[in-house]
């Protein structure tokens, strides 16, 4: 079966995210969110938080947490939900309520319950590449990320800044601009 996922980049600083969990998996999820969107508004709810999870999230002023059981009202005003506990029945309950409310939900280690996945990310300057294996092998995605981090030049930001300046200087209709940009970037393709 083909990978039918649609890759999008979300402005998490304009959305409200709920993470249910406070352990290792929750730390992995929230750190992935905050590494990519340090201004993300995140609320975490869990009956227990690991000390390293608390130490990490306390660096981010827009992240709040509550040490208690999940309540259905925690979904009020949320846009995204991440379930990151070891409590499968709780995940199923949260997913069902989120679906009723048309909220997108990620359930750790349960691809069948996920509306979206947190992909492996490569970032150099303004260049950001998300890698998906359709939930089949996060380990492979991490290996591909490491490869891309190594082969993408460190000066890629300078290249992008130059291309942006060139694009902004172009006159004419959209098709003429695309043609000019394709011409100047054709040398950037990698061929064996």
Predicted regions and their residues:
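E1/E1-like adenylate-forming module used to activate ubiquitin-like modifiers
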Residues: 107-157
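Hydrophobic, well-ordered beta-alpha structural blocks that scaffold small-molecule cofactor pockets
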Residues: 1-56
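An accessory alpha-helical subdomain
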Residues: 135-192
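Structural motif
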Residues: 16, 79-80
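ADP-ribose/adenylate-binding Rossmann-like module
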Residues: 80-86, 91-117
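Residue-level detector of alpha-helix initiation sites
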Residues: 24-25, 89, 135
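Short loop/edge segments at beta-strand edges and connector loops
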Residues: 46, 65-69, 109
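Glycine-rich, highly charged phosphate/nucleotide-binding loops
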Residues: 58-76
